[in-house]
Every structure is written in structure tokens, then in C-alpha cells.
């Protein structure tokens, strides 16, 4: 009896997952996330240098982050841009150095372009959530500015805290001595989950449940880690782009990776947005089934009378 219940429960869970995957596929097709990702990748490449310039300017404004700029750059390029990180870092740093020599008007233009990227992310994600109500202009600008200013500071603070924990000798000689290096090794994964969770909770102009956002963030982070390893493997085993483009190979490689990254971000957003829709649909199906069963019982009783 117990085995039959277990098999029935497992079958019901698997059927539910399969139905959710069908619903998710339909949603992804309707939203054309490949086109959205292409648009965001294009805007990201235009905004990449301004975003990095603004980020580094914010970090340099705080003395506590003065000595860790190079560590932050290395951490980002090694963990979030696979294989071609060194060449990308060299070019972007050169572009940022040139941009920082500009006038106040030029630097202001960089900030505007950086805000343009955040605005496009906002519109794309709210399109996935089917939200028609727009935020007031003041609220939107405040949110974009908060991302530009607080984002780099929080990232720097996280890395400083991690470096401090690693430098402590609190766990040396204990059973936990091997835990800290393991946590540090998983740090990019934790950052990815936290970043995706923040995006899926804050950006949509609608209420998003924490569990739904967490599920989407975990799936997106796992896909991101797999994507990094797969993309790095492709570049090392099949170096066709370097053979064709030579010194310019960094450009299409970077575009491909940014495009793939946005596909992953949007898939996580689709999962987060699809969860409440699917659960509501399941609930309605159960209610309708119960009503149908009640009606059939009533008709049966009337027939017996």
C-alpha cells in the first residue's frame, strides 16, 4: 500500500514537472527571449565600458576599496568571462582609461549610457512579467541610480569581507579548516544566485514571491556555471574564431558570451514568472474537477430518487 502511494505521488510530481516545462516552453516561445537577449547583448556591449568606468569610479571614491580594485577586476574576469577574460580585461581597461580622461560632459554621457542599459533590462524583464503599469519617472531614475552607486559598493564590500574571513586563523587546526576554502571556491556561484535573486525580486514592477525568485535564481546560476564551462571548452577545443578573426576574435567571442548570458538571465526570469501562473492554473483545474465531481454526485442522487 505504501509503495503504491509512493509511486502515485512520484508519478504526480513528474507529471506536474512535465506540465510546467510545457507551460514554460510556450511562454519562452511567446516572449521570444532570443530576440530580447540579442537586443540586450547589443546594448550591453555599447554600455560595457561606461558601466565599468562608473563602477570603478564609485569604488575609487571609498578609501577602503583603494587596494582591491585589481582583485575585483581579476575576480570578475576570471569567474564571469570564460577563457578570453585576459584579453577582454586588457581592452576594457584601456578603453576605461581613455574614457576617464574625458570632460565632465563626456563622463555624464557615460552615465547616461549606463542608465540606458539598466532601463532596457527593466523593460525586458517587465515584459516577461506582463506588467503594463509603469513606475513613476522619479522612482525609476532613483532605482537606476541606486544600482549604479550601491551595486559596486556592495560588490566591493562582499569581496573585502570574504578576504577578511579567509585571512583569519580562526578555523586553522580545526575540523572546519577545509570548509573556508570550499566556500571561497563556491563564491562565484553564491554571487550569481544572489545577483539573479535581487534582479528577479526588485526589477519587476509587481509582487514576486521569494521562493519563486529563488528557484529561478538557482536555475539561472546553475545554467550560468554550466555555460561558462561549456563556452570555455568550446573556445579551447574549437578555436575557429581565433583562426578566422585573428586579433579581432575577442569581439565576436565577447558578443557570443554576453548573448548566452542574457539568454540564461531571461530563462531564470521566465521560470520565476511562470511559477505563479502554473500554480494558479493547477489550482483552478483542481477546483473545477471538484465542482464537476460534486455535480455528478448530485445528478446521481437525483437519479436514484
Curated annotation (Swiss-Prot):
Domain of life of the native organism: Bacteria
Keyword Nucleotide-binding in record: no
Membrane topology field: Multi-pass membrane protein
TM region(s), chain numbering: 45-65, 102-122, 137-157, 179-199, 213-233, 247-267
GO cellular component: a single term: plasma membrane
Annotated localization: Cell inner membrane
Main location: membrane
Keyword Acetylation: no
InterPro entries noted in UniProt: UPF0761_bac, Virul_fac_BrkB
Keywords assigned: Cell inner membrane, Cell membrane, Membrane, Transmembrane, Transmembrane helix
Family annotation (HAMAP family): UPF0761
Family per similarity comment: Belongs to the UPF0761 family.
The protein's name: UPF0761 membrane protein Shew_3545
Protein's organism: Shewanella loihica (strain ATCC BAA-1088 / PV-4)
Phylogenetic placement of the source organism: Bacteria, Pseudomonadati, Pseudomonadota, Gammaproteobacteria, Alteromonadales
Amino acid at each position: 500500500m505504501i509503495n503504491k502511494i509512493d509511486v502515485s505521488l512520484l508519478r504526480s510530481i513528474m507529471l506536474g514537472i512535465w506540465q510546467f516545462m510545457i507551460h514554460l516552453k510556450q511562454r519562452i516561445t511567446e516572449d521570444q527571449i532570443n530576440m530580447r537577449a540579442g537586443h540586450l547583448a547589443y546594448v550591453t556591449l555599447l554600455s560595457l565600458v561606461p558601466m565599468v568606468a562608473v563602477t570603478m569610479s564609485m569604488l575609487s571614491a571609498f578609501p577602503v576599496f583603494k587596494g582591491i580594485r585589481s582583485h575585483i577586476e581579476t575576480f570578475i574576469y576570471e569567474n564571469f568571462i570564460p577563457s578570453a577574460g585576459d584579453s577582454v580585461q586588457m581592452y576594457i581597461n584601456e578603453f576605461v582609461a581613455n574614457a576617464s580622461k574625458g570632460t565632465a560632459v563626456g563622463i555624464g554621457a557615460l552615465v547616461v549610457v549606463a542608465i540606458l542599459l539598466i532601463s532596457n533590462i527593466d523593460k525586458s524583464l517587465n515584459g516577461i512579467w506582463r506588467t503594463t503599469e509603469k513606475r513613476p519617472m522619479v522612482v525609476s531614475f532613483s532605482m537606476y541610480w541606486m544600482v549604479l552607486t550601491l551595486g559596486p559598493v556592495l560588490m566591493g564590500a562582499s569581496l573585502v569581507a570574504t578576504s577578511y574571513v579567509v585571512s583569519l586563523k580562526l578555523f586553522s587546526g580545526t575540523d572546519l579548516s577545509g570548509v573556508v576554502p570550499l566556500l571561497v571556491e563556491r563564491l562565484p556561484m553564491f554571487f550569481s544566485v544572489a545577483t539573479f535573486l535581487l534582479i528577479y525580486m526588485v526589477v519587476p514592477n509587481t509582487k514576486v514571491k521569494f521562493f519563486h525568485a529563488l528557484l529561478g535564481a538557482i536555475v539561472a546560476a546553475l545554467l550560468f556555471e554550466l555555460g561558462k564551462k561549456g563556452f570555455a571548452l568550446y573556445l579551447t577545443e574549437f578555436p575557429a574564431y581565433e583562426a578566422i578573426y585573428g586579433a579581432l576574435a575577442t569581439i565576436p567571442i565577447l558578443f557570443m558570451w554576453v548573448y548566452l548570458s542574457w539568454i540564461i538571465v531571461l530563462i531564470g526570469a521566465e521560470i520565476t514568472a511562470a511559477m505563479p501562473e502554473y500554480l494558479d492554473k493547477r489550482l483552478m483545474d483542481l477546483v473545477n474537477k471538484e465542482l464537476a465531481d460534486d455535480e455528478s454526485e448530485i445528478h446521481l442522487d437525483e437519479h436514484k430518487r
